[in-house]
Amino acid sequence: MSKFLDMLSGSQCVSLEKCGDVVVSTNDCMIALYCHFCRDLFTQLPEFLRHLQSNHSDVLHFTKEHNVYSVEELLSGEQGKAHEDAQSAGHNSSSGDSSSLMNSEDSRAIEGSEDNSDNSPMKPEQIGKQSEINLLAEVTNILLQTNDKELKPENGVFNRPRKKANNESSSLKICDLKSHTIARTSRKRMSMVKNRILRVLDSDLSAKLEIKPPEPNSKLSITEPIQEDNIPGTCFDTPTKPIPSSSQLSVRKSSLTEANQICTKYAEKKTAPTMPKLLNCVPKPILTSQQAHTNAEISEINETYHLAASQVTKTTKTFPVKITQIDILQPVKLPKTLITPINEEGVSDQVENSTNNINNAQSLPKENTKKFFKKRSELGIKAQGSPNKFFKIIKSKANPIIVKRVQTTSAKASTNKIQIRSNDKTNCFASEFNSTKIRKLKMENCVDLKSEDPCANTNTRLNKLATISSCEILKAVGLPAITDNPIEDTLLPDELETIRKKADQFIKIYRKYDSIWNYRKICPPAKPDFISQQIFALTREVNKTMLCNLANSDIKGIINQISVWHYNIYTQYIDLDTISENARYTLKLFSFLPVSFAYFCKCCDDIFILKKEYLKHLISHQVRFQCTKCIKVFKYKGYYEKHLRNAHS
């Protein structure tokens, strides 16, 4: 084929130009032609050629107007005679139904003409009867033909097209297709007519065969008295349904009677002789079905009422309180700074002073209120045995915990033993109890980066707080200026020099582990297992060189505090003049740190970039879940997260 195209292109009389490509879709099993000029698809070759001639003749420079023909048009000249023969045959027999009808009509017309020719002229009555007979014959012929044609597909499947007389070789034309559609629609209509006729015939037969039942309201005229002996025993009428008994109607009655018997037995055990009983032994008259149904419902209601009345209510017995003895304990000797003895005459004056102090405490500045905390040891604890007894626990630095027991019988007697704190203590208590904003600030500051470990066991956590504080951990590394700025005033110059030497040693070691302090800038970021190994190596080296005993959690806390402090200084634009000398010195040491950093969890190997996620993770390690904004405590993590979504989102 390529050689043939080369020969054509080599000759000067033939010019070839690429107009399209063949496109094949394997999913749909379709072939189409793609036009290069307008980027359109055509499923047939003649359409594509006509499209080129009509739309792209200016590009292709066709020499003739009609130089594109379809295969059908080319073959039309050869088969012209065959088409003419087919048309004549189609006009003669357009469809099988029409030909059969014409033949039947011709046969009937010939028979009628023969009869008319043989016989004498007919009367009008005979003509009408004969026309009716002819119509019935036509209808029966049509019905028989349709029945035969409908039964053929059921008996056997047609695998071949239907044969037609004188049209086996010729192809179908438009007129033939029209005749086929006309025949098909006529068959459908005749089948509908046939169904209607059959329905009417069936209805007429059923109407004739039906026996009308006698009317229910009709009465027979009785002229003689009825004799019961002459009435036969058999009756052809439908027997009446038996009247259901009361036991069948009231289904719940049996269960109610059983429940009533159980209640009566239970009442007899408790010696309650006045229990209502049901009287079911009275003989009931025979009732109709409606009356029996209504009586059964009424009996159910009455029985349920008796059952409700039979229940015994439990009453609680209350006895008046009798005071047998009043013991007044001796007053315990306590220091005057904590507790002052109060007489009965001065109680009202001190209560008024306490209320004034509480009102004044609300107007205190926030700086003074931050120093005071409410202690559990100063609160009153009620005794579990009696509601009139309580213990008052007071804790001081000089003396251990002192418990004073106060026993009272009424509110008036208890005023003699009430002891009120001094004015300073009441101010502290009121200011701490009434200022929720201060507590919010405390929680937010504490949760930002806690120096203590958020471990699950509270006992170990408290022991760790008692032994080592955050400032002491930072002192071991030489970085106390991160949290406590005015520490230089309390330290001697020799101590400051030793702290700075420790800081230099720690920073030299810490600078080696760039995968920890430069975690966010390393691409791709290191895996948590590798970073946990690096932190373990860092702690081991720090403990060896600086002669201290720090855990991995302590090193993680120091790293988090250093990164947060460095980030706050650079983001808040703090002047260097306002910072202490020790803080400036440490800031110069940490000049290699980037601004972006990551949070390392103390209890596990997780690493967080966002602060919110880190705080949520810290709370998940604690026993209770506490909100940092509204100071609510939750038992489970799901409740806490739902509260954050609903209240603070």
UniProtKB/Swiss-Prot annotation:
Tissue: Expressed at a low level in a variety of tissues, highest expression is in testis.
Record flagged with keyword Ribonucleoprotein: no
Stretches that traverse the bilayer: none
Coiled-coil stretches noted in the UniProt entry, renumbered to this chain: none
Positions of region (Disordered): 78-126
Chief location: nucleus
A GO CC term attached to the entry: autosome
SMART domains referenced in this protein's UniProt entry, alphabetically: ZnF_C2H2 (SM00355)
Zinc finger (C2H2-type): 33-56, 599-621, 625-648
Gene Ontology biological process terms from the UniProt entry: male meiosis chromosome segregation; male meiosis chromosome separation; male meiosis I
GO molecular function, one term: zinc ion binding
Compartment(s) where it occurs, according to its Swiss-Prot or TrEMBL record: Nucleus; Chromosome
Keywords, alphabetical: Cell cycle, Chromosome, Chromosome partition, Meiosis, Metal-binding, Nucleus, Repeat, Zinc, Zinc-finger
Stated consequence of mutating S131N: In strain: MW11
Biased composition annotated in UniProt, kind: Low complexity: 88-104
Top-level taxon: Eukaryota
Additional detail: Drosophilid specific gene duplication generates rgr and tef. Teflon has a function unique to Drosophilids.
Function as written in the Swiss-Prot or TrEMBL entry: Specifically required in males for proper segregation of autosomal bivalents at meiosis I. Expression is required in the male germ line prior to spermatocyte stage S4. May have a role as a bridging molecule maintaining adhesion to hold autosome bivalents together via heterochromatic connections.
Assigned protein family: Belongs to the Teflon family.
This protein's name: Protein teflon
Originating organism: Drosophila melanogaster
Upper taxonomic lineage: Eukaryota, Metazoa, Ecdysozoa, Arthropoda, Hexapoda
